[in-house]
């Protein structure tokens, strides 16, 4: 894989020479394969693991996630089609930690950019009983895939929608939790998807961080005061990650919350110079996964303020 020169220069300056060289080596390796069991259908602790993978490595931050030694032909597996497990990138399973730590009572949750359904099926598995998940996808054909995967998963407390983020603004203060896995430049997908490499450019990064702020501005009014916004991307740069978190803190008065993460997990923290608020970045040379980024923000208590971000995108 030949990485874009601008990406190399920026990421080397962000991580430092030694860390960048380790990342570059990792990006030339095969990505790990991981699945997450549906314990309502096929319990990981019972026959599931011995049937699909032995010996196995657990995904440390997921109660039902495991790594496989190789990528299987999942489309030929009736258990896959029955919703007994979901093929999901391991680092994105870290969403579970935020939900388990902060959501203790039944909640109404919106997964805003939900297709194909990995995080939605996962969230539905760990939300308290009595919760409702609204899984949304703006692209129509992808929303149909989302609906199919959630149907296979089998939990009844789910609604699938096909709306633009701005459509939710009138549901003022409606959601307890919003997960925004926003469209990004996809740097964390480089070793899984050659198209992500060919489509990357500094200009696309610029478009992405502006689009991300527009999405957050559109959806912010529908979050309850005191509610949680979980922000995630699959990219490394600070423009789409830390700088957007800082912007939400300064623009909306959001509180940036910590998520419990043992040092043994080797999750990388804040890379933005002069800032130390908690964020969680998975770098493939340090953790067994791809380039996932996550931060958790709490909306301040009090009156909902409508804010519209003006961008050129």
Which ranges hold each PLM region?
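S-adenosylmethionine
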Residues: 1-313
């Amino acid at each position: 894989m030949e990485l874009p020169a601008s990406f190399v220069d920026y990421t080397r300056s962000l991580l430092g020479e030694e860390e960048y060289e380790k990342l570059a080596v990792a990006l030339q390796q095969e990505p790990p394969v991981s699945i997450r069991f549906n314990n309502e259908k096929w319990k990981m602790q019972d026959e599931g693991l011995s049937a699909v993978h032995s010996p196995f490595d657990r995904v440390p931050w997921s109660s039902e996630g495991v790594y496989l030694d190789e990528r299987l032909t999942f489309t030929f597996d009736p258990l896959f089609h029955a919703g007994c497990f979901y093929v999901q990138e391991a680092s994105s399973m870290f969403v579970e930690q935020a939900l388990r730590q902060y959501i203790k009572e039944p909640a109404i949750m919106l997964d805003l950019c939900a297709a194909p359904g990995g995080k939605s099926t996962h969230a539905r598995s760990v939300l308290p009983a009595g919760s409702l998940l609204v899984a949304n996808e703006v692209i129509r054909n992808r929303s149909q895939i989302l609906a199919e995967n959630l149907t296979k998963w089998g939990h009844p407390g789910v609604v699938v929608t096909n709306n633009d983020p701005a459509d939710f603004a009138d549901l003022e203060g409606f959601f307890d939790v919003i997960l925004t896995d926003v469209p990004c430049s996809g740097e964390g997908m480089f070793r899984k998807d050659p198209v992500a490499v060919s489509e990357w450019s500094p200009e696309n990064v610029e478009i992405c961080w502006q689009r991300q702020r527009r999405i957050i501005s559109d959806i912010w009014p529908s979050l309850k005061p005191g509610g949680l916004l979980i922000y995630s991307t699959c990219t490394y740069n600070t423009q789409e990650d830390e700088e957007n978190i800082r912007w939400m803190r300064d623009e909306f008065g959001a509180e940036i919350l910590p998520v419990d993460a043992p040092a043994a997990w080797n999750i990388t923290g804040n890379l933005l110079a002069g800032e130390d608020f908690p964020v969680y970045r998975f770098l493939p040379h340090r953790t067994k996964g791809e380039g996932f980024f996550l931060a958790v923000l709490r909306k301040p208590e009090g009156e909902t303020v409508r804010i519209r971000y003006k961008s050129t995108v």
